[in-house]
Amino acid sequence: MQNLALTPSGDSVTPGEAYLADTPVLRPHAGTQPDLCVRWNRIPLTASSVDVVVYLHGFSQRGGAMPLAEKAANSGLDMSGRKRPTIAMLPRGNWLSYTWYDFPALLSGGMDRLVDYGLQRFARAIGRGTLAVDRLILAAHSGGGMPAVDVIAETRRPPDELFVFDGLYGRDPATGNPMRGLETIDWWLGDRLAREPEREGALRVIYIEQQTGPFSRQVGELISRRLADVEPALAEALQRRYRIEVSLLQHSQIARRCLPELLTGSDAEFDWSR
């Protein structure tokens, strides 16, 4: 088992990155090692809890030979603008065939186990017994989008914030309802909004119409219906954090551009001109 290499600076750990192999919860996944990328911003050595970001990557032209670093480089997991102590985890998915990946090991509570494992490894590295989760953020790009919806349906710790970057393709009509999963998002959205404004959350969907437009627009309708029942002053604030938006960027660039801004503030306004 590899050790996380942390660099203390005064009373904090400086920002860093590590790659771990043979992650227990990910053992059923086919693909290369290492299978887990962990990143963190500045974290106080006395911290009892941290925010956690889990990022589900999409397909790869390299198929089963894809190195995890390929996805880390374009993930947008840049926390330099984030003030809260945060640990990000990017698990390698399960290679199916051709370019396709999914995340079956994160179903049935697997994401909870992944988060617990990552925090345990980090806590051990700083000489702590445990670290608790404060806020949980789930982000997904491309082929990671629909698996993220499935993960939410089977987790004991639903995310406070959900960011999906051109990933809501819907289901193959040959296997059933192409809009299956909307009911999960609607349930999560209702539960999430019930916690506002005391515990703020977000749902940001960035999409390209010809690729993920139909499902994404249905999510937009769910948001509109839910916010219609909210007191107007609060609804105005929520609309900045719960919304869908058309991307003016090429598919592969969306997460790398948008996620750093959303990790800084979930109500971020994107300047597509730059």
Task: Describe the residue ranges of each PLM region.
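Loop/turn elements at helix/coil->beta-strand transitions in domains of secreted/extracellular proteins
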Residues: 48-52, 83-88, 132-135, 156-161, ...
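The feature captures the conserved acid-bearing segment of alpha/beta-hydrolase catalytic domains
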Residues: 156-258
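Alpha/beta-hydrolase fold nucleophile elbow
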Residues: 129-142
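Active-site machinery of serine-nucleophile hydrolases
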Residues: 47-122
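A domain-start/cap signature at the N-terminus of enzymes
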Residues: 1-52, 86, 229-240
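Solvent-exposed loop/turn segments at secondary-structure junctions
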Residues: 58-62, 93-98, 142-146, 167-171, ...
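Catalytic active-site module of serine/aspartate enzymes centered on a nucleophile-bearing elbow/loop
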Residues: 255-274
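Short glycine-enriched nucleophile-adjacent loop
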Residues: 145-156
